[in-house]
């Protein structure tokens, strides 16, 4: 049966019964977002509600973020008791909780904002939150969903129970999380600035339309994986990209969250590969291109704030940390994604593939899937997509990049990480991912 994975209301009834205030973290977001934004201008409200969220993007400090556990050598430890797994889980859900707090604060200060300012502020926060959910879904598979207070009230009638009480949240299937993330990104896209986040100015380093288009392309490229909920059985029976349908908005359309419907001339149904190609083309239309300076090949870069402090454990003195760009989203990745999607959709990805090779000083060659994977492993070595690529290509469990001791310990269950044991102990509604139960 063909599935329409971008239509929010086909998902909401089955999904919302699982939504409750999550147990995933025991820090209150107010600890990170000081004050309530009750005084000052729109600029000051932005500084209180949105600017702090970018501190969580990248996770470059040791033991924080998701970059460390994305490395293949980290697979040597897959125990639910692994401290890094818990730190990454906590990091992601702390950021999600902060986003929800920010949304509540923006709602509280609506009188100080124009309608456009409110829509733009909330869109930026929801885009950051969607990115965090994307990372959590990719790592842990079945995860809980947290919403802001206002969103919870909207969904409460559909769920038949309160989603803002103190009950701890259960998990949702990975396919449901994909529905949610894709819909969120589609809805916020028209309200974000069209400029590149690398351009100097007020949007420098922030989430803009090119960043969201990149994420939508990435979600579509991996839809075969994310739509298959029984990964412990391997991926031979996973759905086919040609059979997964996305309702793609070719213009702004109306927001489904408010009950609107995009008109027929503003949307069309595409399969997963066509959807990936569509959003890659959007990035080209927005002026993205390969540049001589690698820094300009990014849709966005995560920056360590210049005034960030680093604790030296030897002398307990804080030292300034220099700003360091991390190139998470690069246009070379966009071209390789498009080439792969075209090949998987029985098309010809040679033009895009060889643009990347020419930029790297390499001769042209056939754009086979094997060649594309090989070049992704080399050209995107600094990104966190290597593990994801191997899973998508069906090479993860037999990768030559893994040590034999790691290979022998991996099973189909290893495609996602275990739910951290400390999170399971805190929230009795969480269930361990299949294959890891014996390790608890």
Protein language model annotation of sequence segments:
Residues 1-33:
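Bacterial Sec-dependent N-terminal signal peptides
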Residues 24-61, 292-296, 420-440:
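Membrane-proximal, proline-rich intrinsically disordered regions
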Residues 130, 217-218, 323-359:
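Extended amphipathic alpha-helical segments enriched in small hydrophobics
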Residues 137-139, 144, 196, 219-231, ...:
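Short coil/turn linking the two alpha-helices of tandem helical-hairpin repeats
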